[in-house]
Amino acid sequence: VTVDCSGYPKPACTLEYFPLCGSDNQTYANKCAFCNAVVEKNVTLRHLGKC
């Protein structure tokens, strides 16, 4: 599974809840929050859902 993070980072994210687990073992609330972390911290997707 991959997440397309082109167009990120964004200045603000919605409150939509669709959890993604990052390689830093942190659960991100949605694609926007995850993709911002990808750009800032070079995180990768571990799996969909909470960590």
Swiss-Prot record:
Site (Reactive bond 3): L15, E16
InterPro entries cross-referenced by the UniProt entry: Kazal-type_SerProtInhib, Kazal_dom, Kazal_dom_sf, Prot_inh_Kazal-m
Main localization of the protein described in the UniProt heading: secreted
Compartments where located: Secreted
Classification via SMART domains: KAZAL (SM00280)
Glycosylated sites: N42
Key words, A-Z: Disulfide bond, Glycoprotein, Protease inhibitor, Repeat, Secreted, Serine protease inhibitor
Entry keyword Glycoprotein: yes
Gene3D superfamilies on file: 3.30.60.30
Domain remarks in the Swiss-Prot or TrEMBL record: Avian ovomucoid consists of three homologous, tandem Kazal family inhibitory domains.
Protein's name according to its UniProt entry: Ovomucoid
Organism: Nothoprocta cinerascens
